[in-house]
């Protein structure tokens, strides 16, 4: 009640005050109107030529304006410049765009670009001259073009190709800040874009830029990091050293050379490798790197290259911006600096598109806008110090998000350095350790990061947002960084494209940047050099593909291992459950399938056709069983692959238990080509595993089809823990989630860790006094129908794949499984070694899905697809 009384007493006072304010405002408003009218009338009475304006009078020594103001070069020293001298005569020489004030200006020799009436004739107009000064619709405001044909002006017989890189532009930026980037967002809307483009590992600037113009993995083209040492050259490479211009570092054939070798000209405005005489040649036109050159000047120069006479004009161009990478390092990916940088690069990109439109090239040029990698936030309290693991640091370390360790004394100790001991000392040391140490050959095969002497043998795979460094003296933390696992969402890069060759208003699934080189060759209609990409896998980006892929032709034909005798000629295998030859003959007779049974098992267990063998001189035969089919390699004495289909769990009864300690010889395989059971003695670290799991059989009798020597593969005992858990638990889970899966699995031999199948002589080197070679890896490819209402064997459309390439090692130290059940680490281990079907093909010499009724280019999309499990950014 007291507060209400107080309020009532104050109201009269407030009303009086309000009345005074109203009167004061009315008086001020009246005065403002009078002053405005006075100024307007006063100015209106003066003649324009006596206003003292420098418009069209800049640096005219004879001009005298109002009160004798001047516009000549010395007016500032005299202090008699006209009021608009700075804006008209000085500022106009510093900007790259027109405005209404500049339109029709007197030509200024010092201008960056011109808005004078004769600029079109003299080819020095600012990029937006037509839209600002002649009233044409700007590129940004123009509707998306939907013409099916190229709209090139006279003199442009074929569309030029512009490759534009914005360093460190992570894909998420375009989703989060799209409204702040109207020009780039329009390109995304009108053209084609991927959800993201995957960078190669390590996700660094030089390796990925060179990969983009090469189609090669860093291990193949030699630029394996921004900083590296080559023991053969005995030199160090860094971004700040002159060594980066030494052609000895740069292997392969970059895009500009591919174009030049086939009669085209190429121009690069900054690109890693363009300043080195690779194969003895530079690009037709190139600019030495200078980070201080304004983005607008770079764009203006590229536009001038497009103005060159036809005989001199390049067909292929590159453009490079350091942003938003520079700002991302300084402030982190979520910062005001990055937002400002995105606006700057968007403005510069808009200048390019406006300049193209002014030349009527905006629907003629094929332009690709991409990035080399993304950006991750780092923190100074997320650092792993090697001094916490070693009492003394006696090695050299490349620090950061993708660390490598080598000998400190080089070249003397380079090859003798004990890398294995370093990895052991860094493995499973802490429960909350934020990196995994690897010997480089043991890294996930999908990375293709091993076969190069510049890749040091010790590698640390670091958790997101963490850095690994030598000691606490390293304070280079905070802000942003990159180089991490290329599956991290923060490392995802942008890819957008627009032009007469590209589809419009389309989003495509992610792909890897090794595929861009082949795409650019197709745009230029030239033949690519050999590369790691899969030619034709990006045909779905194009309106009319230039290259039509076909399935690889099989190199080694198969035979059928025939059934001759129901009893083995000789055998050292035992199966106590088969007590006499009659029982043995009965189960062996099950291997003798009729043609109808063969047709039935092929339909279910090879729904996409058998894998074709692309290795030379491989003697192999097909072995048919009711529950699986395998391709048996006679020289290796083991199956090269086995294929079977696991139905959805609800479609089958509980599986019968497996008969223990039962093995017998496969009577279809001669003893000279078969494994012996005595090979797997208890005193060895090797035991036998089954490529097709006997427990997957639907009846107790049919499991005997799997308990045979032709289904055996050698496995380390520790590896079988992981292998068995996958087949008994995870495989059932995947089949349940996907309405059944087709499984193809087999051994891999990659002793020289080059990512390709080993030749027989390479395998023979590693037999170690045994007749059976030990695989370096095993692969598993799960295939299901993308439409989960269909099973694999009756899938009418697109397929889904889940391939794994699992290292075959004596220990499971990678997963630190001590005291943990398999449920806590096996699935994570498989996930860490996810791969593409194409990776499996390269490592096995097999070719998949040849009988799937689908265009080959779509099959290649499937083969180059890499499943990911990352959700955090």
UniProtKB/Swiss-Prot annotation:
Domain SMB: 51-93, 94-138
Region Phosphodiesterase: start-end pairs: 160-544
SUPFAM superfamilies: Alkaline phosphatase-like, His-Me finger endonucleases, Somatomedin B domain
Annotated region described as Nuclease, given as residue ranges: 580-873
Maturation and modification: N-glycosylated. N-glycosylation is necessary for normal transport to the cell membrane, but is not the apical targeting signal.
Xref: InterPro entries: Alkaline_phosphatase_core_sf, DNA/RNA_non-sp_Endonuclease_sf, Endo_G_ENPP1-like_dom, ENPP1-3/EXOG-like_nuc-like, His-Me_finger_sf, Phosphodiest/P_Trfase, Somatomedin_B-like_dom_sf, Somatomedin_B_dom
GO term, biological process aspect, one: ATP metabolic process
Residues annotated to bind ATP: 204, 226, 275, 289
Extracellular-side positions: 31-873
Segments on the Cytoplasmic face: 1-11
Transmembrane segments: 12-30
Disulfide bond sites: 54-71, 58-89, 69-82, 75-81, 98-115, 103-133, 113-126, 119-125, 144-190, 152-364, 380-477, 428-816, 561-621, 573-677, 575-662, 785-795
GO cellular component terms, A-Z: apical plasma membrane; external side of plasma membrane; extracellular region; plasma membrane
Binding site for Zn(2+) 1: 167, 205, 372-373
Residue ranges annotated as motif Cell attachment site: 78-80
Glycan-modified residues: 236, 279, 290, 425, 532, 592, 685, 697, 787
Catalysis: reaction(s): a ribonucleoside 5'-triphosphate + H2O = a ribonucleoside 5'-phosphate + diphosphate + H(+); ATP + H2O = AMP + diphosphate + H(+); CTP + H2O = CMP + diphosphate + H(+); GTP + H2O = GMP + diphosphate + H(+)
Membrane association type: Single-pass type II membrane protein
General function of this protein: Hydrolase that metabolizes extracellular nucleotides, including ATP, GTP, UTP and CTP. Limits mast cells and basophils response during inflammation and during the chronic phases of allergic responses by eliminating extracellular ATP, a signaling molecule activating these cells in an autocrine manner. Metabolizes extracellular ATP in the lumen of the small intestine, and thereby prevents ATP-induced apoptosis of intestinal plasmacytoid dendritic cells.
Protein name: Ectonucleotide pyrophosphatase/phosphodiesterase family member 3
């Amino acid at each position: 009640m007291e507060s209400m009384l107080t309020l009532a007493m104050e109201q009269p006072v407030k009303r009086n005050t309000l009345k005074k304010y109203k009167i004061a405002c009315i008086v001020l408003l009246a005065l403002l109107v009078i002053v405005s009218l006075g100024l307007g009338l006063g100015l209106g009475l003066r003649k324009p030529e006596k206003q003292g304006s420098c418009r069209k009078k800049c640096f005219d020594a004879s001009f005298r304006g109002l009160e004798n103001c001047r516009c000549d070069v010395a007016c500032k020293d005299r202090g008699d410049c006209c009021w608009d001298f700075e804006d008209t005569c000085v500022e106009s020489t510093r900007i790259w765009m027109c405005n209404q004030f500049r339109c029709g200006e007197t030509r200024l020799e010092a201008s960056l670009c011109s808005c004078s009436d004769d600029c079109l004739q003299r080819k020095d107009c600012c990029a937006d001259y037509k839209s600002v000064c002649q009233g044409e619709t700007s590129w940004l405001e123009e509707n998306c073009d939907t013409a099916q044909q190229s709209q090139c002006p006279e003199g442009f017989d074929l569309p030029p190709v512009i490759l534009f890189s914005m360093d460190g532009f992570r894909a998420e930026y375009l989703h989060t800040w799209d409204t702040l980037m109207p020009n780039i967002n329009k390109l995304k809307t009108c053209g084609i874009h991927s959800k993201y483009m995957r960078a190669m590992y390590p996700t660094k600037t030089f390796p990925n830029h060179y990969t983009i113009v090469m189609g090669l993995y860093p291990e193949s083209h030699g630029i394996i990091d921004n900083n590296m040492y080559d023991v053969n050259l005995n030199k160090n490479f860094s971004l700040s050293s002159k060594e980066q211009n030494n052609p000895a570092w740069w292997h392969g054939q970059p895009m500009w050379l591919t174009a030049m070798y086939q009669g085209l000209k190429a121009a690069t405005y900054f690109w890693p490798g363009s300043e080195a005489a690779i194969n003895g040649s530079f690009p037709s036109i190139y600019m030495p790197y200078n980070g201080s050159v304004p983005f607008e000047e770079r764009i203006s120069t590229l536009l001038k290259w497009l103005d060159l006479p036809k005989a001199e004009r390049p067909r292929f161009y590159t453009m490079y911006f350091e942003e938003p990478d520079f700002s991302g390092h300084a402030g982190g990916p979520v910062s005001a600096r990055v937002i400002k940088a995105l606006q700057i690069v968007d403005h510069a990109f808009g200048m390019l598109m406006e300049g193209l439109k002014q030349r009527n090239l905006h629907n003629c040029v094929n332009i690709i806008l991409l990035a080399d990698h993304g950006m991750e936030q780092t923190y100074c309290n997320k650092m792993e110090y090697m001094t916490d693991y070693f009492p003394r640091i006696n090695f050299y370390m490349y620090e950061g998000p993708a660390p490598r360790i080598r000998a400190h004394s080089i070249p003397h100790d380079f090859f003798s350095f004990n890398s294995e001991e370093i990895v052991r000392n860094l493995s499973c040391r802490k429960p909350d350790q934020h990196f995994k140490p690897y010997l480089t050959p043991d890294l996930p095969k999908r990375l293709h990061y091993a076969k190069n002497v510049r890749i040091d043998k010790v590698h640390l795979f670091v958790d997101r947002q963490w850095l690994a460094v030598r000691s606490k003296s390293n304070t280079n933390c905070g802000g942003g960084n990159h180089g991490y696992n290329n599956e991290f969402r923060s490392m995802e890069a942008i890819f957008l494209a627009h032009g007469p060759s590209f589809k419009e208003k389309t989003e495509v699934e992610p792909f890897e940047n090794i595929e861009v080189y082949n795409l650019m060759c197709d745009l230029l209609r030239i033949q690519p050099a050999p590369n790691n990409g899969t030619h034709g896998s990006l045909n779905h980006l194009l309106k009319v593909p230039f290259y039509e892929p076909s399935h690889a032709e099989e190199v080694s034909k198969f035979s059928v291992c025939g059934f001759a005798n129901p009893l083995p000629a000789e055998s050292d295998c035992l199966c106590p459950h088969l007590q006499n030859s009659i029982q043995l003959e009965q189960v062996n007779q099950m291997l003798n399938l009729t043609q109808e049974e063969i047709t039935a098992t092929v339909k279910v267990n090879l729904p996409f056709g058998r894998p074709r063998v692309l290795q030379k001189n491989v003697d192999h035969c097909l072995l048919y069983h009711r529950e699986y089919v395998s391709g048996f390699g006679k020289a290796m004495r083991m199956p090269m692959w086995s294929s079977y289909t696991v139905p959805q769990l609800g479609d089958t009864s509980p599986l019968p238990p497996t008969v223990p300690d039962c093995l017998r010889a496969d009577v279809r395989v001669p003893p000279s080509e078969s494994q012996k059971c005595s090979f797997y003695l208890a005193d060895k670290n090797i035991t036998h595993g089954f490529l097709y799991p006997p427990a997957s059989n639907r009846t107790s009798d049919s499991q005997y089809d799997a308990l045979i020597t032709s289904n055996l593969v050698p496995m380390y005992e520790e590896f079988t823990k992981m292998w068995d858990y996958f087949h008994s638990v995870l495989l059932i889970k995947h089949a349940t989630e996907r309405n059944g899966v087709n499984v193809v699995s087999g051994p891999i031999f990659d002793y020289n860790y080059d990512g390709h199948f080993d030749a027989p002589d390479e395998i023979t080197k590693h037999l170690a006094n045994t007749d059976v070679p030990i695989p370096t890896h095993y692969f598993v490819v799960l295939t299901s129908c993308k439409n989960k209402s269909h099973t694999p064997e009756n899938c009418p459309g697109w397929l889904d794949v889940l391939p794994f390439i699992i290292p075959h090692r004596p220990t499971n130290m990678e997963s630190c499984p001590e005291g943990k059940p398999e449920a806590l680490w096996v699935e994570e281990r498989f996930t860490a070694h996810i791969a593409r079907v194409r990776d499996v093909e390269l490592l096995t010499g097999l070719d998949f899905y040849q009988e799937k009724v689908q265009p080959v280019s779509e099959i290649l999309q499937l083969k180059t697809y890499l499943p990911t499990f990352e959700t955090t950014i």
